[in-house]
From Swiss-Prot:
Matches recorded under SMART domains: RNAse_Pc
Function noted in UniProt: Endonuclease that catalyzes the cleavage of RNA on the 3' side of pyrimidine nucleotides. Acts on single-stranded and double-stranded RNA.
Lineage start: Eukaryota, Metazoa, Chordata, Craniata, Vertebrata
Statement: the UniProt record of this protein carries the keyword rRNA-binding: no
GO CC annotation: extracellular region
Database matches in CDD domains: RNase_A_canonical (cd06265)
Catalysed conversion reaction: an [RNA] containing cytidine + H2O = an [RNA]-3'-cytidine-3'-phosphate + a 5'-hydroxy-ribonucleotide-3'-[RNA]; an [RNA] containing uridine + H2O = an [RNA]-3'-uridine-3'-phosphate + a 5'-hydroxy-ribonucleotide-3'-[RNA]
Span of the signal peptide: 1-28
Listed name of the protein: Ribonuclease pancreatic
Subcellular location: Secreted
Length: 156
């Protein structure tokens, strides 16, 4: 009798273990869209000419853990405006993929470049503010930016 009940619960136990095995790896893992936002969005960031902006932001956004990320760009526009770029001019990505899009208008950005001679753990960045078109790679449902590909000057 007890054996029959145990055997009846076996398929349920197997199902629970399969679901846990499928769900568990994705728990706590940052999505590509969230990583893009962490690494590139600073909608509330001031456009002051603070020379330590990049040093502070790169550290705060976890891009100097274990190494110094050599180049990064922060976009100072509302997230929805950056997400809208995914429905603007389609361009080829630097890696040859076809899922990149160029913003139809210039956006306020800050470029951060690792200064020569800078070594981990003392990552030091040069901060330069610009107004440029951005190019982002998009994917997913909803279709959102997942990679910052480039920034380009106005071609007029």
């Amino acid at each position: 009798m007890a054996l029959e009940k145990s055997l009846a619960l076996l398929p349920l136990l197997v199902l629970v273990l399969l679901v846990l095995g499928w769900v568990q790896p994705s728990l706590g893992k940052e999505s590509r869209a969230k990583k893009f936002q962490r690494q590139h969005m600073d909608s509330d960031g001031s456009l002051s000419s603070n020379p330590t902006y990049c040093n502070n932001m790169m550290r705060r956004r976890n891009m100097t853990q274990g190494w110094c990320k050599p180049v990064n760009t922060f976009v100072h526009e509302p997230l929805v405006d950056v997400q809208d770029v995914c429905f603007q001019e389609n361009v080829t990505c630097k890696n040859g993929q076809a899922n990149c899009y160029k913003s139809s208008s210039s956006m306020h950005i800050t470029d951060c470049r690792l200064t020569s001679g800078s070594r981990y753990p003392n990552c030091a960045y040069q901060t330069s503010q610009k107004e440029r078109h951005i190019i982002v790679a998009c994917e997913g449902n909803p279709y959102v930016p997942v990679h910052f590909d480039a920034s380009v000057e106005d071609s007029t």
